[in-house]
């Protein structure tokens, strides 16, 4: 498609303030794609002008933001993308490179962090994932994704935002591409204007320790779920009045929650599972509960007292 020939859209749909927020969870991104396809089939004219993503959700967010096709067709393409994905398209599955990385990690620990001539940036080599994303997301010569800018210019998309963790500064950073964007800053969180590229997606989805950090500008970045304590915040700052997010686990009953996950001393896999759930899943649930409490509090306030709340400083997230 020749994007330069498209005419900007001036009319706006009634659901213009609806945002889609997609969190992390690795292969759970495939579940997100399936749910989005079901939603698009049920509501084929649905517009999602604000798209935000973290980790695996950044892959889905960026793919949808770059599509010229209507939502039903775009989600079908997204599902096909996940169905075509195999482990060897995510990381190098050969044993020798993995053993070499593990050995170098061990030497760094024993040596007090000294990297030597060839520092290991991650246990897994994710060059295959970068190639997979470059094939899935058409790029300009400078790496920009023309589909995103086209959708912003024509009014189909207001903004897309991806979040990552800066290992250089310790901050959570949200990259935003959109129109009429007002940036925000909170303690240990900041936003930046950016032209979204595959590198931003790689940075947002770089699992700690497992995947190598990604350098953008002068900073090194890893998975966006590590430091982002308010995952709904980017959507709110970008003007969303409603947020659609997709849970990748069901709400357990009290009996199920109290049931032991393992007998005896917890194995490393169980410890890592709890850790990663805390990073990628728990914060979204907590942020939703916090937003619901704030909405109930505002509903209980007289309309005259609500006027101007958040107008000067933006959402308190």
Annotate each PLM feature.
Residues 1-54, 62-317:
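Patatin-like phospholipase
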């Amino acid at each position: 498609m020749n994007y330069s020939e498209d005419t900007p859209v001036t009319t706006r749909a009634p659901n213009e303030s609806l945002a889609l927020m997609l969190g992390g969870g690795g292969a759970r991104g495939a579940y997100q794609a399936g749910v989005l396809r079901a939603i698009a089939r049920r509501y084929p004219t649905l517009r999602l002008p604000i798209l935000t993503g973290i980790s695996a959700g950044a892959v889905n967010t960026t793919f949808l933001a770059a599509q010229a096709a209507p939502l039903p067709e775009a989600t079908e393409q997204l599902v096909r993308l996940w169905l075509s994905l195999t482990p060897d398209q995510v990381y190098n599955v050969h044993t020798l490179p993995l053993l070499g990385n593990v050995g170098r990690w061990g030497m760094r620990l024993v040596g007090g962090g000294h990297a030597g001539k060839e520092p290991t940036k991650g246990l897994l080599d994710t060059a295959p994932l970068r190639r997979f994303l470059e094939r899935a997301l058409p790029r300009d010569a400078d790496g920009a994704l023309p589909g995103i800018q086209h959708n912003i210019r024509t009014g189909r998309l207001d903004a897309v935002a991806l979040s990552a963790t800066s290992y250089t500064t310790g901050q959570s950073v949200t990259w935003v591409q959109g129109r009429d964007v007002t940036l925000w800053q909170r303690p240990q969180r900041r936003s930046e204007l950016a032209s979204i590229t595959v590198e931003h997606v790689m940075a947002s989805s770089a699992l700690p320790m497992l995947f190598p950090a990604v350098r953008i500008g002068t900073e090194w970045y890893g998975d966006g779920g590590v430091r982002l304590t308010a995952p709904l915040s980017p959507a709110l700052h970008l003007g969303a009045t409603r947020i659609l997010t997709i849970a990748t686990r069901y709400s357990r009953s009290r009996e199920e929650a109290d049931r032991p996950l393992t007998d005896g001393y917890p194995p490393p896999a169980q410890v890592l599972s709890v850790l990663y759930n805390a990073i990628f899943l728990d914060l979204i649930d907590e942020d939703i509960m916090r937003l619901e409490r704030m909405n109930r509090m505002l509903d209980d306030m007289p309309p005259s007292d609500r006027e101007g709340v958040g107008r000067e400083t933006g959402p308190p997230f």
